[in-house]
Amino acid sequence: MEYKVLALGDVASETGLQLLEKKLRAFKKEHDVRFTVVNGENISGSGLTKAQAEALFAAGADVITLGNHTFGKPQIAAYLDEERYILRPANFTGRAPGHGYQMVDCGAFSVAVLVLIGRCDLDFNAENPFTTADKLLKAQTDKPTFTLVEFHAGATSEKLAMAYYLDGRVSALWGTHTHVPTADMQVFPKGTGYVTDLGMTGPIRSVLGIRPEQSVEFFLGGLPGRYQAAEGPCSAQGCIFALNSDTGLCEKVDRIEMK
């Protein structure tokens, strides 16, 4: 049987969150989406608050993922230990609060979600994402119907290499972090659905979610300052993965944009 999974790119502002509060549930119903993963690490610019996480769950997210801005709001650390459906990268060092892998029982099917962070182009102290994926996948005792991997990374080569490495072992793998949607949606030879980057949920007229004039000023040689979220209409970018419960693999990947 086919089940549709929706993955949405980094929510880059409060206005991006507001868009999801208004549109997400109706969109899921219209497209028969059964499971939704949303990257929420940029709602506050850098980081996520407990109130924002609760609002995102209420809007229709089943799992919230985080990346290099996981601890942008330090107070989230304690919440990560108690909220099992907010996932930070699994290859953070062992002392980091929270967890990066979770099994979700959806009744008719089960989903395992794994979050990893890349080591190319990211100044972050993390363990090898490839060996971390191996370790966690091999440790699966109750085999889920589907396994989903979010790879929060800057380098396309690292994301593609991970997709080839995990092809046939996971249902879908998507990238986040760059805030720019890529057009390489595909199903790999052994059945893993893939896209290099989901894109962003945030202001359309922006530079990766921030006010264009602030970014222009920075590149003109201005002093670094506190960036502010851009204003105006928003869109939510991502992909729908059509997964087969008989094989646990992907049959189709479609790009979506919600406005």
Label for each model-derived stretch:
Residues M1-K259:
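Acidic, metal/ion-coordinating pockets
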